[in-house]
Amino acid sequence: MLIIELLKAIFFGIIEGITEWLPVSSTGHLILVQEFIRLNQDKAFIEMFNIVIQLGAIIAVMLIYFERLNPFQPGKTAREVQLTWQLWLKVVIACIPSILIAVPLDNWFEAHFYFMVPIAIALIVYGIAFIWIEKRNAQQEPAVTELVRMSYKTAFFIGCFQVLSIVPGTSRSGATILGAIILGTSRTVAADFTFFLAIPTMFGYSGLKAVKFFLDGHHLDFAQVLILLVASLTAFVVSLLAIRFLTDYVKKHDFTIFGKYRIVLGSLLLIYSFFKFVF
């Protein structure tokens, strides 16, 4: 029944809206949830669905940060306009590693890593990394506490960390936040740049997935269009709340709790995978 499929779409949209911005892996969570709750659709649609519903999350970022990211915003001084263009240049530079590395390798990683065990391992490894980096940061102050002070070189290397998210379970936001902190930025700067970098990255990735879906000879029926729209709209609404939560959270707390969550979830997935294999 279509109503059941739409309820599932709402559920998946909630998962996407929460996990896209928290450093816990949205794709990993969607793959995990779909182990137990699946859309009654073909494999090609589900693979495309898992990526394209990110568009709702991206639009949420654009809405929240529209004035800050718009160089043509009325009332901005010449200096503010210049800084906005410089921010966009940093974002473009940070996209280069993904264009050169992640895009060509995407299909290979999708074929070999989109199942439970690699997701579990990635969750645990990056969970440990978050705990380690926060312990290190407790003993030193960040070198970059404002986004305008971030260098183009730092932006490029943050983009290199983003490439790591090609492995499901890594988390795009997790990889970029972790990389930014390792490179000396504050948590606030790391989170902000992660949000901004998501706009071209996720638009591009979602667009490529959609184009590939149609070039492979697939098409969307009315029910599938409705499922995509409902899931994307849900992801948009939930993302508005998740982004507000994370921006407020990082002002007073570190990412240790997310590291612990990743380790616990990854461990449970490994146990589940073991029993599923044995029995």
UniProtKB/Swiss-Prot annotation:
Superkingdom of this protein's organism: Bacteria
Membrane-spanning segments: 2-22, 44-64, 85-105, 113-133, 163-183, 188-208, 223-243, 255-275
Catalytic activity: di-trans,octa-cis-undecaprenyl diphosphate + H2O = di-trans,octa-cis-undecaprenyl phosphate + phosphate + H(+)
Annotated GO MF terms: undecaprenyl-diphosphatase activity
Enzyme class per UniProt: hydrolase
UniProt topology in membrane: Multi-pass membrane protein
Primary location: membrane
NCBIfam families referenced in this protein's UniProt entry, alphabetically: PRK00281.1-5
Membership in a protein family: Belongs to the UppP family.
Name of the molecule in the record: Undecaprenyl-diphosphatase
Organism: Streptococcus pyogenes serotype M5 (strain Manfredo)
Gene behind this protein: uppP
